[in-house]
C-alpha cells in the first residue's frame, strides 16, 4: 500500500514538472535576465541613474513574445539607509539598442514596499526589432506622490561578478 502511494506521488510529481516545463516553453520568452542595482552617473537609453547606489537582493525580468513584461525585485534598497528611502513607486522601461539605445516602452507605476519589494506585470507594445534589450527599474513616485513620468533608473537587467553561480562543470574557470 505504501509503495503504491509512493509510486503514484512520484509519477504525479513528474507529470506536474513536465507540465510546468511545457508551459514555460510555450510562454515564448524573448528575454529573461536577473536585475542588479544601479550606480550613480550611469546613463542607459538616455535615462540617468539615481544619485546614490542601489542594491537588489533578488530580481528578475522576463519579456514574452506577446509583449507581457514581468519584473520582480526583492530588497531593492539604498544600502546607506537599509530601505528604499523616499521612493514609493517604480515602473519598468524597455530599452532597445543597448546602453546607447532608446526607451521604447514604459509600464505604469506600481508600489514599492518599505522593504524594497515590487512586482510589475504589464503588457507593452513591442517594436518589430529590439537589439541589446535592457529593462530599467525606474523611480516613479516619491513619498506617495507619483511623478508625471518615470524618473531615474535605480536597477536594471544585468549581472555582477559577485553573483552566485555553480561552476562545478565549468572546467575553464579557475
What are the functions of these language-model segments?
Residues 91-95:
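Beta-strand signatures of extracellular beta-sandwich domains
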Amino acid at each position: 500500500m505504501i509503495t503504491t502511494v509512493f509510486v503514484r506521488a512520484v509519477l504525479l510529481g513528474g507529470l506536474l514538472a513536465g507540465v510546468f516545463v511545457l508551459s514555460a516553453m510555450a510562454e515564448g520568452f524573448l528575454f529573461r535576465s536577473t536585475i542588479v542595482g544601479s550606480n550613480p552617473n550611469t546613463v542607459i537609453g538616455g535615462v540617468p541613474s539615481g544619485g546614490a547606489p542601489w542594491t537588489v537582493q533578488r530580481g528578475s525580468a522576463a519579456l514574452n513574445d506577446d509583449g507581457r513584461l514581468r519584473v520582480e525585485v526583492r530588497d531593492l534598497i539604498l544600502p546607506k539607509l537599509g530601505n528604499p528611502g523616499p521612493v514609493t513607486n517604480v515602473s519598468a522601461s524597455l530599452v532597445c539598442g543597448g546602453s546607447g539605445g532608446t526607451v521604447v516602452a514604459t509600464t505604469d507605476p506600481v508600489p514599492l514596499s518599505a522593504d524594497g519589494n515590487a512586482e510589475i506585470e504589464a503588457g507593452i507594445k513591442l517594436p518589430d526589432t529590439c537589439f541589446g534589450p535592457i529593462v530599467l527599474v525606474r523611480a516613479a513616485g516619491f513619498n506617495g506622490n507619483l511623478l508625471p513620468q518615470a524618473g531615474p533608473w535605480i536597477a536594471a537587467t544585468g549581472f555582477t561578478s559577485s553573483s552566485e553561480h555553480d561552476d562545478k562543470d565549468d572546467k575553464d574557470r579557475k
